[in-house]
A protein has these predicted regions:
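Conserved, well-structured core domains of diverse proteins
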Residues: 1-36, 68
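Catalytic beta/alpha-barrel core
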Residues: 70-74, 100-101, 121-123, 161-163, ...
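Glycine-enriched alpha-helix->loop->beta-strand junction motifs that scaffold or abut catalytic
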Residues: 63-68, 238-244, 266-270, 287-291
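Active-site cofactor/substrate anionic-group-binding motifs, chiefly glycine-
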Residues: 38-75
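Conserved, mostly hydrophobic/aromatic
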Residues: 14, 47, 62, 219, ...
Length: 291
């Protein structure tokens, strides 16, 4: 029986790493690694796809530091897609799908939408998504009538830009015109994006954040081997998820491989990660299937 009982145990406080001579300075060290073929992490940390660990708050915090969070799948398709959108909208170089209101909205609608999404400004558009104005916290600060039309308080005629190269000079444009939000429109005056001074500050404060090509925080989401997997992946893809994790206890099975092939053939440009596995044979089988 004695050979089955560990007689000595060590914990972190019991072990010290003895420093040795080094010519490597901290600024010379890179902790970056690849999460997928297309996603580089600045720190090798991924949060678990567990309902007690990762929803949008954790995913935002992890991505801000350079890692990536995997949203758990124990929720409805609609809610999981919403969690993805919360991460993607939390900060960005340019918000590609800004939340908007139309002229039929009220001050109460604007207050509710700002509070729900934790935002400070909402572009006002018509039925063709043409920009009519913008309403911000400053416009609503002293408003008491929740039934007042949004057209009565919105700011119209604010500076907008259609020049993509203006993005590089967004901070100077905002400062020069003493505004905090810069709507971006196309040649037909349709809203295509929104740049905020707050996001520019966030970019400066967190230079190692894990972001996509549009400056948005990256996020992954878990799916299972279920009948509605394609429907879930479609919703997540439409929400701009960066990677799909096929999350299962044993990933080296026929069912998992078939789901992987089905997802990859339907969404060929989406990065797919599969787990859990424990052997090189399993890894090769999943790579061959598209992971």
């Amino acid at each position: 029986m004695n050979n089955k009982i560990m007689k000595e145990g060590l914990t972190y406080d019991d072990v010290l790493v003895v420093p040795a001579y080094s010519e490597v300075l901290p600024y010379m060290v890179s902790t970056s690694t690849k999460f997928t073929k297309n996603i580089i992490l600045n720190i090798p940390i991924v949060s678990a796809a567990m309902d007690t660990v990762t929803e949008s708050i954790m995913a935002i915090a992890i991505a801000q530091e350079g890692g990536i969070g995997v949203l758990h799948k124990n929720m409805s398709i609609e809610r999981q897609a919403l969690e993805v959108r919360k991460v993607k909208r939390s900060e960005s170089g340019m918000i590609l799908d800004p939340i908007t209101l139309t002229l039929s909205a009220t001050v109460g609608d604007a207050f509710a939408l700002m509070r729900e999404n934790k935002i400070g400004g909402i572009p006002i558009v018509d039925e063709d998504v043409k920009l009519l104005g913008i309403v911000t916290n400053r416009d609503l600060r002293f408003e008491k009538d929740m039934n007042l039309s949004i057209s009565e308080v919105m700011t119209s005629g604010q500076l907008i830009t259609t020049e993509l190269n203006d993005l590089e000079n967004a901070e100077s444009i905002l400062k020069e015109n003493k505004i905090e939000k810069l709507p971006i429109v196309n040649s037909d005056n349709q809203l295509v994006g929104l740049i905020t001074f707050k996001d520019i500050i966030k970019n400066r404060m967190r230079p190692n954040a894990c972001k996509d090509q549009y400056g948005r925080l990256r996020v992954a989401a878990a799916v299972g081997v279920t009948d509605d997997v394609l429907k879930r992946v479609e919703a997540l893809s439409n929400a701009s998820v960066d990677a799909i994790i096929i999350d299962t206890a044993h990933g080296h099975t026929k069912g998992v491989v078939e789901v992987l092939k089905k997802v990859k053939s339907t969404f060929p440009n989406l990065d797919i990660v599969v787990g859990n596995i424990a052997t090189s044979a399993a890894a090769q089988a999943l790579i061959d299937a598209g992971a």
